[in-house]
């Protein structure tokens, strides 16, 4: 008699867990940004977790990851657009780099080879470079991916990557003894560009065709401009910026992700800052993510 009774109870149990939750509508911790050539913008949200798509000034969830650790993009940290216009994303939860397919699903490119992917850069031939903050390496792999990417350079605390037209890779470091900006030639030779440490907590770097570079600095509440001869100066500083992290090119402008105020700014060449899209600030939601096991003891975004 117990079996029929149990079945009846299960059938009568309300299916609250099966009810679909409403789609998120607001940023939680937007820390990385990338723009397509057509103006569509993608934003990595560490605390959502997942990726937003911004089109015509409106944001929508592009990919909603699980909150379960060791699942794809549970700890998304960086984005890039590849040579064919596909979205790439680096995730420290699964130690992986993903490419989104035509169905909008992330497909892994390695077999969990990356430690903490902090930045991605893609060459014109599709070669993918990944900055690994945990292993202090720059990994290189072909467009189709590789089970074990090739070690391209060893640089301490790499956080940002950008390529120039000649195929040189520019690496932004937090604390390397060889300086905070280093250039890696196609043959792997490393040259120090900024040999000292003018940046407080740099996160991302962008290089323009004329050699000018820009760097987000979380602790200095600013975006730096670095001249082609390697001289840094603060380009924009203070309000409305709070603690900028993400940075990318968008036409002649830059896009800046400021996670603590849940805002994506558009930064024009004349230093004008305008809000592309933002969400109301929630002190709890914008708290810095809890470091994961294996995360090196570097300062978190503030």
Residue ranges, per PLM feature:
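An edge-strand/N-cap motif at the start of beta-rich repeat modules
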Residues: 18-44, 48-52
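Conserved beta-strand positions in repeat-built beta-propeller and related beta-rich domains
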Residues: 41-47, 87-93, 128-134, 169-176, ...
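A short beta-strand motif characteristic of beta-propeller blades
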Residues: 18-24, 60-69, 105-111, 147-152, ...
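Bacterial N-terminal signal peptides
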Residues: 4-14
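Beta-rich, blade/repeat-based domains predominating
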Residues: 24-38, 69-84, 112-125, 155-167, ...
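A short loop-to-beta-strand structural motif that recurs across blades of beta-propeller domains
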Residues: 50-52, 96-98, 137-140, 180-182, ...
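Short loop/turn segments that connect beta-strands within beta-propeller blades
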Residues: 54-58, 100-105, 141-146, 184-189, ...
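Mid-chain, structured segments of secreted extracytoplasmic proteins
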Residues: 57-98
């Amino acid at each position: 008699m117990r079996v029929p009774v149990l079945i009846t109870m299960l059938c009568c149990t309300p299916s609250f867990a099966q009810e679909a939750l409403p789609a998120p509508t607001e940023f939680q911790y937007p820390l990385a940004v990338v723009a397509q050539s057509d103006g569509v913008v993608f934003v990595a949200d560490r605390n959502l977790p997942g990726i937003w798509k911004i089109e015509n000034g409106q944001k929508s969830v592009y990919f909603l990851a699980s909150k379960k650790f060791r699942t794809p993009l549970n700890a998304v940290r960086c984005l890039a657009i590849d040579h064919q216009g596909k979205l790439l994303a680096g995730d420290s939860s699964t130690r992986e780099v993903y490419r989104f397919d035509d169905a909008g699903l992330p497909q892994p490119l390695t077999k969990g080879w990356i430690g903490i992917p902090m930045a991605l850069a893609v060459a014109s031939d599709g070669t993918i470079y990944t900055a690994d903050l945990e292993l202090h390496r720059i990994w290189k792999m072909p467009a189709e991916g590789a089970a074990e990417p090739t070690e391209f350079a060893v640089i301490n605390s790499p956080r940002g990557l950008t390529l120039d037209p000649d195929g040189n890779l520019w690496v932004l470091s937090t604390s390397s003894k060889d300086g905070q900006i280093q250039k890696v030639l196609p043959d792997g030779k490393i040259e120090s560009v900024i040999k000292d440490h003018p940046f407080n907590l740099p996160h991302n770097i962008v290089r323009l065709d004329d050699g000018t570079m820009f760097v987000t600095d979380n602790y200095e509440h600013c975006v730096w401009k670095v001249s082609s001869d390697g001289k840094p100066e603060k380009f924009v500083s203070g309000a409305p910026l709070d603690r900028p992290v993400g940075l990318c090119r968008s036409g002649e402008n830059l896009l800046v992700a400021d996670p603590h105020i849940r805002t994506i700014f558009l930064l024009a060449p004349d230093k004008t800052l305008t809000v592309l899209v933002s969400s109301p600030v929630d002190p709890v939601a914008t708290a810095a993510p809890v470091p994961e096991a294996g995360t090196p003891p570097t300062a978190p975004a503030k």
